[in-house]
Amino acid sequence: MIAKLKGILDSITDSYLIIDINGVGYQVYSSGKTLMKLIKEEGSIVSLFIETHVREDRIHLFGFLDNTEKVAFNMLQSVSGIGTKMALHILSNLTPHQLQIAISSQNRHQLKAISGVGPKLIDRLMIELRDKVANINTIANNTSLATLSTDSNTHDNILSDAITALIALGISRAEATQILSDIYALSPSISVNELVRTALQRRAK
């Protein structure tokens, strides 16, 4: 089960993105809001929380920048008649916080403004999620604690991520390790993306 992906953002379409990890491209479906936030990050290293759906003939990956959106995605699917496509459509129009407020305050108008969301579906959302939406942040925070240690930008993690990125671009591990170590020694507070960009610039000279 894939729970998280970290790699180079290869490309973005209007419904999914492709993350390149060691030369393998993973197709990840995301909400419109997530895709818009990532549109300027093409070529950079990104990290996404993943919800994996396994079917008889295929595997679908759904990606989220934060765990709150992932929790909201799964919560929406607990409502009768809502599948992955509609859940992403709703989250393309409302943030998890906006969804939480709309349902808690029984604001039907905010949900009605979303195309494809009719009166009957709104009724089900209001009834079935009324007692659940207040827990979105709590659930998200609790599940995030399990992966917190793997997200820390320690020296080893930064170098490892940068090396992976350069290898994906066709640079040998030995060369990537040497050039990145030299740069990192001079700028220990540098981010992964800055480290990769600096390495590519130095290599091009």
UniProtKB/Swiss-Prot annotation:
InterPro entries: DNA_helicase_Holl-junc_RuvA_I, Hlx-hairpin-Hlx_DNA-bd_motif, NA-bd_OB-fold, RuvA, RuvA_2-like, RuvA_C, RuvA_C_sf. Residues 66-144 are annotated as: Domain II. Its main location: cytoplasm. Keywords: Cytoplasm, DNA damage, DNA recombination, DNA repair, DNA-binding. Residues 1-65 are annotated as: Domain I. The keyword Cytoplasm applies. GO terms for biological process: DNA recombination; DNA repair. Pfam families: HHH_5, RuvA_C, RuvA_N. Residues 154-205 are annotated as: Domain III. One of its GO terms (molecular function) is four-way junction helicase activity. SUPFAM superfamilies: DNA helicase RuvA subunit, C-terminal domain (SSF46929), Nucleic acid-binding proteins (SSF50249), RuvA domain 2-like (SSF47781). Residues 145-153 are annotated as: Flexible linker. One of its GO terms (cellular component) is Holliday junction resolvase complex. Has three domains with a flexible linker between the domains II and III and assumes an 'L' shape. Domain III is highly mobile and contacts RuvB. HAMAP family: DNA_HJ_migration_RuvA. Homotetramer. Forms an RuvA(8)-RuvB(12)-Holliday junction (HJ) complex. HJ DNA is sandwiched between 2 RuvA tetramers; dsDNA enters through RuvA and exits via RuvB. An RuvB hexamer assembles on each DNA strand where it exits the tetramer. Each RuvB hexamer is contacted by two RuvA subunits (via domain III) on 2 adjacent RuvB subunits; this complex drives branch migration. In the full resolvosome a probable DNA-RuvA(4)-RuvB(12)-RuvC(2) complex forms which resolves the HJ. NCBIfam families: ruvA. The RuvA-RuvB-RuvC complex processes Holliday junction (HJ) DNA during genetic recombination and DNA repair, while the RuvA-RuvB complex plays an important role in the rescue of blocked DNA replication forks via replication fork reversal (RFR). RuvA specifically binds to HJ cruciform DNA, conferring on it an open structure. The RuvB hexamer acts as an ATP-dependent pump, pulling dsDNA into and through the RuvAB complex. HJ branch migration allows RuvC to scan DNA until it finds its consensus sequence, where it cleaves and resolves the cruciform DNA. Belongs to the RuvA family. This is Holliday junction branch migration complex subunit RuvA. It comes from Orientia tsutsugamushi (strain Ikeda).
